């Protein structure tokens, strides 16, 4: 049996749960319970704060978990966890920022003794030390952007996705500390346990199959027999397109193929030019 730790709230919670459900690992949640069953009796779920999950997995409380790369770095657990997968969403950057009217325009302008407010004191401190800087770290639990304007700090170190929030709060980016995405991580001892490793890899395989399918589309069409060679040359598919007879029309063939989502528009245009018709483009839930 393995225990999977998932964020109990926040921006990555919903998409992660949706991916798990699409992978076939349906989670049965009862009320506000911190634990849940899945369709597999050997895989149980624990809901926790995303910031606590790196330590829970490292310490073996959970065998596998989903969290942000920034949170792994904050808890200094990166080297102690088995990195299994980058979901490539939940993108954010941890940046140092200063008020727009500040004389600090780059990391070179930051001086020892300045105050910096952050929700990431550990990561911020280690980064500044690498830069040879000794600042006073002010730990906050939210609303970091206001700190320079109420005399709490000179700078902030906070997450941003687009930079819009910084601009709205009259802040300018001074230094990029780290870029972060959502990660699937495992306990190293759990990965060495044959039975647990099998279950963890089943979870990993299911997630990969959903993420891979998100970038693909199944395209189906009826096409003239004399154009099949030209058509199959522009839709090679994953292992070659599937071509089959149409019983009611001996001049046409049915062709199915999987193509990249970003090539759908161009491909459909070319298929129509070659005489393909009844073209269907369908999302795919999983590719194994």
Curated annotation (Swiss-Prot):
> Is this entry keyworded Cytoplasm?
yes
Q: One of this protein's Pfam families, by short name?
A: HisG
What regulates this protein's activity? Feedback inhibited by histidine.
Gene3D superfamilies xref list: 3.30.70.120, Periplasmic binding protein-like II (3.40.190.10)
User: Which reaction equation describes what this protein catalyses?
Assistant: 1-(5-phospho-beta-D-ribosyl)-ATP + diphosphate = 5-phospho-alpha-D-ribose 1-diphosphate + ATP
Q: What is its EC number?
A: 2.4.2.17
Question: What InterPro entries does the database record attribute to this sequence?
Answer: ATP-PRT_HisG_long (IPR020621), ATP_PRibTrfase_cat (IPR013820), ATP_PRibTrfase_CS (IPR018198), ATP_PRibTrfase_HisG (IPR001348), HisG_C (IPR013115), N-reg_PII-like_a/b (IPR011322), N-reg_PII/ATP_PRibTrfase_C (IPR015867)
Indicate whether ATP-binding appears among the record's keywords.
yes
HAMAP family hit by this protein? HisG_Long
Q: Which family does it belong to?
A: Belongs to the ATP phosphoribosyltransferase family. Long subfamily.
Biological role: Catalyzes the condensation of ATP and 5-phosphoribose 1-diphosphate to form N'-(5'-phosphoribosyl)-ATP (PR-ATP). Has a crucial role in the pathway because the rate of histidine biosynthesis seems to be controlled primarily by regulation of HisG enzymatic activity.
What PANTHER family does its record include?
Answer: ATP PHOSPHORIBOSYLTRANSFERASE (PTHR21403:SF10), ATP PHOSPHORIBOSYLTRANSFERASE ATP-PRTASE (PTHR21403)
- State the name under which the record lists this protein: ATP phosphoribosyltransferase
Q: Which organism is it from?
A: Methanococcus maripaludis (strain C6 / ATCC BAA-1332)
